Amino acid sequence: VCTAQSVKEAIEKVTSKNNNKVIIANWKMNKKFEDIKAYAYVFNKLLKRDKFLAKTKTLIGVAPTMLGMLPAAAMLKNNVVVVAQHVHYEKSGAFTGNVSYDQIHEYNINYSLIGHSETRSMMNVTEGQINKTIKVMLENQMVPVLCIGETLEQYEAKQTGKTISLQIMNALKGVSSENAKKVIIAYEPIWAIGAQTATVPVIKSVIDKIRECLSDMYDEQTAKEVHVLY
């Protein structure tokens, strides 16, 4: 679980080389109200003391649970953005257990993870639904964080490039070049969630493949401008 100190250290590391970065901490199903309160207190203090956001263009986001989004938004200062973990592409309806893009937008929460491997598997989120959600968020001046990644079987079969390219093409189908630049892409190899970790050369090769796919779909400039996270 990400601590306030670990996120602060990540900010230090990336901003030492390049100001124009994005860091998002996914809390998953962690942190109750008191935990959020304690995290926000320490995090706000660290950022204020070192004046990170005054010196950098780094975008910092946290993705709390559905219940944690509003208290996190109220407690976290210094322009830290709150990111939803999942949203539905319909404004409202008979979708038990979901929250809509429009509902979070009403509370000025304008970012959401889309297609995280856990929502793909546990909620049976399809490529078509991911595409619809990305489009409706972009239409409403919101920022989708597209999550992509391959399984251990796909990685061992050397199908990483093919898998992530297909995920990107399906997710951004019908999305213009200008809108594609607003999408954040997060690479999360499913096989590396937990005990295993992806090496720097593996991550770099996948990021290169992501930009190659975007260049083929759009152009080199679009591929350069899209933020890619690991």
Identify the meaning behind each predicted range:
Residues 1-230:
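Active-site loop-to-helix "anion-binding N-cap" substructures in soluble metabolic enzymes
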